[in-house]
Amino acid sequence: MKLLFPIFASLMLQYQVNTEFIGLRSCLMGFGRCRDHCNVDEKEIQKCKMKKCCVGPKVVKLIKNYLQYGTPNVLNEDVQEMLKPAENSSAVIQRKHILSILPQIKSINFFANTNLVIIPNATPVNSATVSTMTSGQITYTATSAKSNTKESGDSATASPPPAPPPPNILPTPSLELEEAEEQ
């Protein structure tokens, strides 16, 4: 029993346990199930080896809503027209369309910006910061800087750092009143 408990506990605490031996293999990042035949209300999205990846109507609605309202400024007009609900649309056309759009969404860089950093008594330094955000993954930030180190080194040694200001005690009205009362 002492030997079985750590093995059982490690299986229960794993992030993702392979449940293929039970027959409940999942697909489409856990939103779908691999089955021989899809139910009436489910749609086939991908293939799981010899089976079909079936997703329910809630997942299909979630994907459509995300593509329609979550990314309207990223996608071009042709894709937006295809996403509008149609009365005579078949499951095959929808599946091909959804799978063709996903690589476009992944390839777009949402968070790219370029800044200009200015250091006093030195030359300007151009820096570009690019960070990408992917759901469920760690965000990495890369910064590249370009400057002339000889010029900035010369300018840094040419001017000494400014001396700190001398400590001045500023007279306050209450201090002036006390001095006037003493006299």
UniProtKB/Swiss-Prot annotation:
Any one of the GO CC terms: extracellular region
Residue spans of biased composition, Pro residues class: 159-170
Q: Where is the signal peptide?
A: 1-19
What does UniProt list as this organism's lineage?
Eukaryota, Metazoa, Chordata, Craniata, Vertebrata
Chain positions covered by the region annotation Disordered: 142-183
Q: Where located?
A: Secreted
Briefly state the protein's biological role: Has antibacterial activity.
Q: Give the intrachain disulfide bonds.
A: 27-53, 34-48, 38-54
The molecule here is called Beta-defensin 129
